[in-house]
Structure formats: structure tokens, C-alpha cells
Amino acid sequence: MKLSRLALLSVFALASAPSWAESVVTVYSIDGLHDGDNSWYQVQFDAFTKATGITVRYVEGGGGVVVERLAKERTNPQADVLVTAPPFIQRAAAEKLLANFNTDTASAIPDANNLYSPLVKNYLSFIYNSKLLKTAPASWQDLLDGKFKNKLQYSTPGQAADGTAVMLQAFHSFGSKDAGFAYLGKLQANNVGPSASTGKLTALVNKGEIYVANGDLQMNLAQMERNPNVKIFWPANDKGERSALAIPYVIGLVQGAPQSENGKKLINFLLSKEAQTRVSELSWGMPVRSDVTPSDEHYKAATAALEGVQSWQPNWDDVAVSLSADISRWHKVTESE
């Protein structure tokens, strides 16, 4: 889930699509599911267009950026569907940027509600250069070692969903916000500096320009095919416990959407059994439906990677309420204001 420049990509109807394919649906999405050729988004958007005649217009940006854009367009909405990650989806709901919509599949998806639904499971992860480091950093304390000075970087909380997840993971791993902030203040001595993009850090790790960075499991697994020196790890706390914050892709219908019915159709399409079954095969993600268990090698690799790692999630509504204050405090303790 990297934060890229907000880019507009239009996914046009297949040549075989019906001649009545004049209607459109516009998606504002966090990135990660449209990476590379034959991505899950690309395959599903093409199939949706072929089945319905509705063209998908796709706008991509960071988790916070796409929500900020929706807020700016509140009086004249341009998007129909929002895909982002916690806590930004909760912020969108609190700011009344999402419309009430009960999907056809809500009963099969844990944590779905009348404003948004999980779309693809995902988890915070960390990566290291396995060519330059014989073993992964075992603990959070290891990351404070002087050998990582200017060789460690994580994306900026508040801008990137994965960067925000690092901050929240520190709270969890150290037992409190105060302890988490104290640690992040110390870690700043090794941090290269702010990064608006999580995804671009992978190439830097692969080339050895930095040794360690943050990421997310789905994105990192997909990137490892093109970045052979990169491996995934999770640092342990002082009890030796490794944990990973669950940060799913989440989808919702935009309040006042210009093509609301088309938005509903696309949401239901992406949450269908057929679409969910292929998310691991095409994009290394994990389906959110309780009645879908893929059998492909990508799914097996993702589940194997998480062995011995405890997944967790906070009360996201509480996180959304305190997010602005937490981001301000992060800037203060890291002296990055």
C-alpha cells in the first residue's frame, strides 16, 4: 500500500464488450491490488465491464490521500467507490463520506457493516536485504543498533496506511502509546527520513541502499518476485512475541456518488465468490469471505509466512478519533515537524 502521486488510470471496456458500454463507475483506491500485469483489479475490472458494459475509471493514491480527495469533493462527488485501509475508512465514515449500503455478501464477511466491508485481508510486515544481512533483525531493540543508521526507513504515519500501521504496531508491541512513542523517538536516529511511499522502499532495500523498511504482506509478497534480495520479517517484543497488525483493504460506496447503482454493482462483483477466489492467485492477497479458501501456491505462501505471528487489530473507531493527535505527537517525538 504505497503512497504514490495521485494518478488517474482508466480501465476501458474490452473490445468484445457490448456496444451499450457507455456507463461508467469511478473508483478511488489505495494502491497494491493493481500492481503489475494481469493484477486482480485489472482482471476483475475487465470481467465486470464484459458482464455489465460498465467502464471502470480508476484513481489511485495513498490511504489518507484518497479520503482527503473525497472530502474536498464533498459538494460535488466524483467517485462512486472508495477502497482504502483502516483507520482511513473509519475517518471517511465519521466524516459522512460513505453511503449506507448492505452488500449481497455481508453475511459471509466478518466485520462488514452498512457503510463499508473488508475487501482483501492484509497485514503489516517488514522487509530486509537478505544478501547484506545474514539474518533478519530479531527484535525491535535490534533495529536501534548503530549499523542501521541511515539504513532504515518507514513510510510516514498519516500519509501512508503502512506508515500509520508502524506507529500503531509500536503502541501494541511496547504495551502503550507512551512506550511506543518513546521507542519511535529512539528509532529516529537510524531512520533515513520521511517517505510518502511505502512501495518504493522495496526497491531501495533490494538494491541495498537501505537494509530495512516497512511494508505489508500482500504488497511485499508480490514485489519479491521482482526484488530477489528482499525477505519478510516481523520483529519480536521483549517477550519474544511477534505480531502483525491486520490492515485489510476495505471498500465502501461514496455518499452522493454520481453513479451509485454502478458502484453497488462493482462492490458486489468484487466481493463475489468468483472474484475472491482469485485474489491470492493474481495479487497475493487473502480473501475476506469465510466461505472461500483458495488452494493456489500464493495463498499457501501467504499463510505460511504468518506462521508463528499473532495477528491483531485495535478498535479502529477509537484509532480514527485520536489519529490527528497521535500523528502530531509522532512528528514531535521524531522531530520531523
Swiss-Prot record:
One of its GO terms (molecular function) is thiamine binding. Keywords: Periplasm, Signal, Transport. Induction: Induced when inorganic phosphate is limiting; this is controlled by PhoB. GO terms for cellular component: outer membrane-bounded periplasmic space. Its main location: periplasm. InterPro entries: AminoethylPonate_ABC-bd, SBP. GO terms for biological process: thiamine transport. Residues 1-21 form the signal peptide. Gene3D superfamilies: Periplasmic binding protein-like II (3.40.190.10). It is found in: Periplasm. Belongs to the bacterial solute-binding protein 1 family. Probably part of the PhnSTUV complex (TC 3.A.1.11.5) involved in 2-aminoethylphosphonate import. NCBIfam families: PhnS (TIGR03227), PRK15046.1 (NF011620). PANTHER family: THIAMINE-BINDING PERIPLASMIC PROTEIN, THIAMINE-BINDING PERIPLASMIC PROTEIN-RELATED. Maps to a phosphate-starvation-inducible locus previously known as psiC. This is Putative 2-aminoethylphosphonate-binding periplasmic protein. It comes from Salmonella typhimurium (strain LT2 / SGSC1412 / ATCC 700720).
